[in-house]
Amino acid sequence: MRIVFAGTPEFAVSSLRAAARHHEVVAVYTQPDRPAGRGRGLAPSPVKLEAVARGIPVYQPESLKDAAAQQQLRDLQPDLMVVVAYGLILPKAVLAIPTHGCWNVHASLLPRWRGAAPIQRAIQAGDAKTGVCLMQMEAGLDTGPVLLHQELPIASTDTGGQLHDKLAELGAQVLSDGLGLLRAGIKPIARPQPEQGVTYAHKLDKAEARLDWAQDADALARTVRAFNPWPIAEATLAGERVRIHGAVALEADHGQAPGTVLAAGRDGIDIACGQGALRLRVLQREGGKAITAADYLNARRDLRVGA
């Protein structure tokens, strides 16, 4: 079976490996090299690096909307196109090129969290579980029928990065299962998504990372987890702007104004919130690296309870 794989970030690498394990991946599509790092030199995507290491031809069109790019894909004579976090829109004409259409690995239990940031939004919302769907693509945004799915519980300590890694591996497994069925001559049953329960996982914005102490501590703790490793939550702590890499919510009937330091010790720095308190455990000062609350307190001798 001739497979064309389309993906860009690290999340897609596990799925590329799964596709290449027992099938012929005739080409990989990924986004063009982008400026990265302090030197802002052009850097290849993680998927491109994996494809090059495997000797798979790589294509990097700016768009798949023009006729030349579509003909290039058509010339590959794909039986199936697998799309995982590619980042480019696939027009209807592209969806119709492969014999079996285009499959997408999506990191949520559709129709919940359609869109760009399903992993982080699931944590932010306090969802007890998430998962991966293998979807038959159509023109709408993540609206296609689901071929296979697998659930995954969200641990109370999961960060966005940790859940990302779990779902990347789960996505590869679900894709492998689907490809195995197709190779055996069994096309998975396409089940339309329910009309109820649709939510959208909008792209992360750095402005969202700014914590408001007037909010509920549980919600703030979830944001800290969801936004680690990017964009990392930030807040003002006793007059200083800090980034918060790790925090937990506490039940506290404090009666203090939001943002007040309630306690400070080796276990963390407790901050009054609109409801409850947030214990800051890992922080980062501007220009510095992430450090424990104990090390932060050693550096900020001026920090006082009640500030």
From Swiss-Prot:
Enzyme class at the top of the EC tree:
transferase
UniProt KW keywords: Protein biosynthesis, Transferase
Superkingdom of origin organism = Bacteria
EC id: 2.1.2.9
Q: Which InterPro entries match?
A: Fmt (IPR005794), Formyl_trans_C (IPR005793), Formyl_trans_C_sf (IPR037022), Formyl_transf_N (IPR002376), Formyl_transf_N_sf (IPR036477), Formyl_transferase-like_C_sf (IPR011034), GART_AS (IPR001555), Met-tRNA-FMT_C (IPR044135)
Positions bound to (6S)-5,6,7,8-tetrahydrofolate:
108-111
A Pfam family of the record is: Formyl_trans_C
* CC annotations in GO: cytosol
> Per the record, what are the reactions this protein catalyses?
L-methionyl-tRNA(fMet) + (6R)-10-formyltetrahydrofolate = N-formyl-L-methionyl-tRNA(fMet) + (6S)-5,6,7,8-tetrahydrofolate + H(+)
Question: From the UniProt record, which GO molecular function terms apply?
Answer: methionyl-tRNA formyltransferase activity
Note the SS bond partners: none
This chain's function reads: Attaches a formyl group to the free amino group of methionyl-tRNA(fMet). The formyl group appears to play a dual role in the initiator identity of N-formylmethionyl-tRNA by promoting its recognition by IF2 and preventing the misappropriation of this tRNA by the elongation apparatus.
Family, similarity comment: Belongs to the Fmt family.
The protein depicted here goes by the name: Methionyl-tRNA formyltransferase
Which species does this protein come from?
Stenotrophomonas maltophilia (strain K279a)
The opening ranks of the lineage are: Bacteria, Pseudomonadati, Pseudomonadota, Gammaproteobacteria, Lysobacterales
The gene behind this protein is fmt
